[in-house]
Design a protein with these regions (language model features):
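Conserved GNAT acetyl-CoA-binding A-motif
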Residues: 111-113, 125, 134, 141-153
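Conserved active-site alpha-helix within GNAT-family acetyltransferase domains
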Residues: 127, 131-135, 143, 156-173, ...
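Conserved beta-strand-loop-alpha-helix junction that forms the acyl-donor binding cleft
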Residues: 116-125, 151-160, 176-182, 187-188
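Conserved acyl-donor/pantetheine-binding loop and adjacent beta-alpha core of acyl/acetyltransferases
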Residues: 78-113, 117
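Conserved N-terminal entry element of GNAT/NAT acetyltransferase domains
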Residues: 1-21, 32, 188
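Conserved GNAT-fold acetyl-CoA-binding loop/helix
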Residues: 31-50, 84, 90, 94-97
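A short beta-loop-alpha structural element at the N-terminal edge
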Residues: 14-28, 39-40, 78-79
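Active-site rim helix/loop that mediates acceptor-substrate recognition in acyltransferases
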Residues: 40-61, 65-71, 75
Length: 188
């Protein structure tokens, strides 16, 4: 996408709170963030996003719209809710075994704002929408009184780690999430 097209797209972009009727789109985002975008969105995952007590609830999401369409989304929330919401969410995830759940590290802690899942649809990538969603999530955390934001970045995605570093995040520790190695990154 050229500079003029990027400028136009940014001028036509807005971020809004997700609504319950965004649940299927959020399920797509979560699959995309997990590099599973070739999977069909299941009714189970959509139902998880439609609930109000799960990690992936529409209440924890913001939607980026560009040119009148949903272009991407960010799921973020206070670490304070993580353990309770995880205990509800993970058993509902299709195909996830108890052994996988037990082997997954804690992603976030109380007292921090967690950026859980981010994805931008392919036709809207490289236009700054992902950065807008990240900065929006950081601002939401700050407005809620959190001074630290965290996220996980897959170790094998060096370009993502570099991107998050440019946005002010620093590697803090290593985490295992559903069998994959991640960096826990922090922005203070």
């Amino acid at each position: 996408m050229n500079r003029t097209a990027n400028d136009f797209l940014n001028a036509q972009s807005a971020i809004r709170d997700a609504r319950e009727d965004d649940a299927e789109f959020l399920a797509q985002v979560i699959l995309s963030a997990a590099h599973l975008s070739d999977m069909d969105v299941s009714e189970d995952l959509t139902a998880i996003c439609r609930r109000t007590d799960t990690l992936y609830s529409w209440r924890n999401a913001r939607i980026a719209c560009a040119c009148g369409k949903r272009a991407g989304a960010m799921v973020s929330y206070p670490g304070d809710i993580y353990l309770a919401a995880r205990s509800i969410t993970f058993p509902l995830l299709p195909g996830l075994t108890q052994a996988q759940i037990d082997a997954t590290d804690i992603e976030t802690l109380p007292g921090e704002w967690y950026l859980d899942s981010l994805a931008v649809l392919p036709e809207f990538r490289r236009a700054g929408i992902g950065k807008m969603l990240i900065m929006d999530a950081i601002e939401r955390g700050r407005n809620a009184g959190y001074t630290q934001c965290t996220l996980l970045a897959e170790k094998s995605s060096t370009h993502l780690v570099e991107y998050y570093t440019r946005l002010g995040f620093a590697i803090e520790s290593s985490k295992l999430y559903l069998g994959n190695a991640y960096w826990r990154m922090v922005r203070r």
